[in-house]
Amino acid sequence: MDFDTNEDLNGVRFAWNVFPSSKTDAMQNVVPLGCMYTPLKEIEGLNVVDYNPVVCAGPHCKAILNPYCMIDPRSNSWTCSICKSRNHLPTQYHNLSQENIPIELQQTTVEYLTTKPVQVPPIFLFVVDITTEPDNLQALKESITASLSLLPANALIGLITYGKVVQLHDFSNDTIARCNVFKGDKDYQLEPLVEMLTGQKMTGSIPNTQVTPFSLNRFFLPLEQIEFRFIQVLESLSQDEWSVKPGERPLRATGSALNIASLLLQGCYKNNAARIIVFSSGPDTINPGLIVDLELKNPIRSHHDIDSGNAVHYKKAMKYYNTLADRISENGHTVDLFSGCYDQIGMSEMRKLTDRTGGVLLLTDSFSTAIFKQSYLRLFAKDEDDYMKMSFSAKFQVKSSKELKVQGLIGHASAVKKTSATNISDTTIGIGGTSTWTMGSLLPQHTYAVFFDIASNGPTPVTGDNQQLAYIQFITNYQHSSGTIRTRVTTVANQLQSFGSPLIAASFDQEAAAVLISRIAVHKAETEEGPDVIKWIDRTLIKLCQKYADYNKNDPSSFRLAGNFSLFPQFMYYLRRSQFLSVFNNSPDETAFYRHIFTREDTTNSLIMIQPTLTSFSMESEPEPVLLDSLSVKADTILLLDTFFYILIYHGETIAQWRKAGYQDDPQYADFKELLEEPKLEAAELLVDRFPLPRFIDTEAGGSQARFLLSKLNPSDSYQNMNSAGATIVLTDDISLQNFMLHLQQSVVNTQK
């Protein structure tokens, strides 16, 4: 089966492209029925139609007209593929013919440009930590200034700065730069805050009235109106004046600043498109939201501290930021969190702020690095029509025919609990209990793992030519950056087959399945012990092989997997070793960052993160992919490693010696110079569109940064097993892929089928 075609046309990839016909059979398949879906995938030739979709009037349905619906031109009616209700066709569909078929009856993915108006342009509230060093702050100010040119002219912008206190800047006066100052150690509530800023008590919701000197929305004004004053204030920012005592950290009120930002937007722009863009240069040292004590003698928590219950502030801080995340999500807003320091800032505690709202989490060493500067500006990337690719206020619904129920979703979203949908499963995977989710923001790369359950407990006979299909429809309503409301609709049909049908096994997409299992594992790792998650992965792999491998009992050498299953075990091997599950040598903030990126990317990029790609360059042959194995490291080759998070060029021992000798500068050795350039050119291509920008590492045999390559390799030759002369020895206690496969085969063949 060509799984890539479905992804190219519809942005969807299923683990199983043919479904079992009963719940029991589905459970025996081990890998859940699920798919990876990219709502705003950039589809070549996507049709955008300039009218509203036709919606089914069936009770609790609201599915949209699609190519799988039955059309009856005689009665001018259509039958919904999801609920089978008959609906009246609007008058514009009454003259259907082979030459006059609407796009939505031809294409399985269609985008509607609806007539619903957008009341308020997008809002960008910049929240800037000023406790950082002057050079770091200056670099940040330059990046923010550069980003203003990428925003729509009518965008509303605001500014909050914070250190020990929180400062809310007021640009409503043309001549005076005003600022409201709040205590950094106070947990403000909505009503008192509104009264403080407007002089009036809050009665119900505040309408988006005209801006006045006393209205709450005076803190958000059009970019085209205040850009000059905004930049003036930005440029005048200096390091926080509160002195830092020796042996102490700066006083930093991140929690209070975020709280005030969220309340301010809630007060005047609830359920309108808004981003809170936070730039932090260290951990919160003031309650509410305190991450670490003021005294430097008390180090910030590690994974070991969290696991052993010694992270004294961790649970309280996480509870505070989770509450903030729920409120911001409910208000329809987004949080982006950018870190620019060597220290941790508390991303582990604050991660739900971005994960529940569709925001960006970025970990960098400084605001002056290329990784921050380019990644931050790529957030505002534009399409060919010069509109920002980011979208706002998204609502994602999954409709399914009676054969299926929705178990849940794993990705950057929040559940809509109040729903009349009837296709919700009793069992939950990820964010469940609903078939509708919200995202304050959507980017084209945002991809969601959606899981399904077979509704029928008993077997449904599927025989003869009467092919039974299960239908799924993904509906994404969102605000486009052009100022329009759009609806992206994708409808797919999957065949149902009885237990034991060879079509089910043939329909297995091992790449999509590996990513779906990985998403579940990462989701489990948030609440379960690491070894328990590893055991779950191992049990899943063993059960799948027991079900679909060919073997003779008690004979490991007879073990065989079909081609579309053969790579799945090695994906699981590299998943077990990945930084998503193996947190040794990573800080909690790094783990939060890695997991955040992993749970938003598509199948291809996710696989690169699980099992990085390795390309070999040599004088004797063309560049070629090689095994991610210590045996691939040779003295006369250059290796290019792509882990998604960093791209590394490794020069073998001989190549490194030639380079140091300067052979590339001698015209006689033009071929060698070309060899050195080849991996750089390929690396540059990988860097062009990736978000966030990966770290680039250039190293050689014996170099200190060669460890970044060696840590990713399968240790075919370790200090425990030094068989191959001339091979690179990897100093690790990790089991090799070969031994892992032997253990797997033994576990499978020694267990009763």
Swiss-Prot record:
- Can the keyword Chaperone be found in this entry's annotation? no
Localization terms from the record: Cytoplasm; Cytoplasmic vesicle, COPII-coated vesicle membrane; Endoplasmic reticulum membrane; Golgi apparatus membrane
Q: Which coarse location class describes where this protein primarily resides?
A: cytoplasm
Q: Look up keyword Transmembrane and say if it applies.
A: no
Q: What keywords are assigned to this protein?
A: Cytoplasm, Cytoplasmic vesicle, Endoplasmic reticulum, ER-Golgi transport, Golgi apparatus, Membrane, Metal-binding, Protein transport, Transport, Zinc
Q: Which GO terms describe its biological process?
A: COPII-coated vesicle cargo loading; intracellular protein transport
Q: Which residues form a coiled coil?
A: none
Supply the SUPFAM superfamilies for this chain. Answer: beta-sandwich domain of Sec23/24, C-terminal, gelsolin-like domain of Sec23/24, Helical domain of Sec23/24, vWA-like, Zn-finger domain of Sec23/24
**Subunit organization:** The COPII coat is composed of at least 5 proteins: the SEC23/24 complex, the SEC13/31 complex, and the protein SAR1.
Q: What does this protein do?
A: Component of the coat protein complex II (COPII) which promotes the formation of transport vesicles from the endoplasmic reticulum (ER). The coat has two main functions, the physical deformation of the endoplasmic reticulum membrane into vesicles and the selection of cargo molecules.
Q: Where does Zn(2+) bind?
A: C56, C61, C80, C83
Q: Record's GO cellular component, any one?
A: endoplasmic reticulum exit site
Q: Which GO terms describe its molecular function?
A: GTPase activator activity; zinc ion binding
Listed name of the protein? Protein transport protein SEC23-1
**What topology does the record note for this protein and the membrane?**
Peripheral membrane protein
Domain of life the protein comes from: Eukaryota
Q: Member of which family?
A: Belongs to the SEC23/SEC24 family. SEC23 subfamily.
Q: Which InterPro entries match?
A: ADF-H/Gelsolin-like_dom_sf (IPR029006), Gelsolin-like_dom (IPR007123), Gelsolin-like_dom_sf (IPR036180), Sec23 (IPR037364), Sec23/24_helical_dom (IPR006900), Sec23/24_helical_dom_sf (IPR036175), Sec23/24_trunk_dom (IPR006896), Sec23_24_beta_S (IPR012990)
